[in-house]
């Protein structure tokens, strides 16, 4: 077998040990590219997150009737909280609203419901059915999530 020694291209650095710049069997026929010849990186658009709204409601049941229909798609344990968090999606076709439901850690009588997105359809049930829930809700400003 032929012993071919080729130099490995390193960024401009004079402090590289010459013994590290040689490898056996490496083809060095490709020409190095300069920074002006490199392909520009495509800038990916950052996905904008929809606003989130959190509500605290004093209730003995976790699933509150808010007038929409929901499908549960997950549940997970949360650190430092004995109560799991449940994940729901709106069942209306084309509606991308999600909600998370979890009991508050210090006060298990409080249910925290976080909504993400805005419904693209009318409410399924009249609002007078859950007037008592609305009177108990504490509305918080949208979360500012940083990536």
From Swiss-Prot:
Disordered: annotated span: 21-52
Keyword Transcription regulation: yes
GO BP, one annotated term: phosphate ion transport
Chief localisation class: nucleus
Pfam families named in the record: WRKY
GO molecular function: DNA-binding transcription factor activity; metal ion binding; transcription cis-regulatory region binding
Binding, Zn(2+): 90, 95, 119, 121
Subcellular localization, as worded in the UniProt entry: Nucleus
InterPro entries in UniProt: WRKY_dom, WRKY_dom_sf, WRKY_plant
SUPFAM superfamilies: WRKY DNA-binding domain
Keywords assigned: DNA-binding, Metal-binding, Nucleus, Transcription, Transcription regulation, Zinc
UniProt keyword Ribosomal protein, yes or no: no
Annotated Gene3D superfamilies: WRKY domain
A GO cellular component entry from the record: nucleus
DNA-binding region(s) in UniProt: 59-124
Stated role: Transcription factor. Interacts specifically with the W box (5'-(T)TGAC[CT]-3'), a frequently occurring elicitor-responsive cis-acting element.
UniProt record similarity statement: Belongs to the WRKY group I family.
Record's protein name: Probable WRKY transcription factor 45
Classification of source organism: Eukaryota, Viridiplantae, Streptophyta, Embryophyta, Tracheophyta
Name of the encoding gene: WRKY45
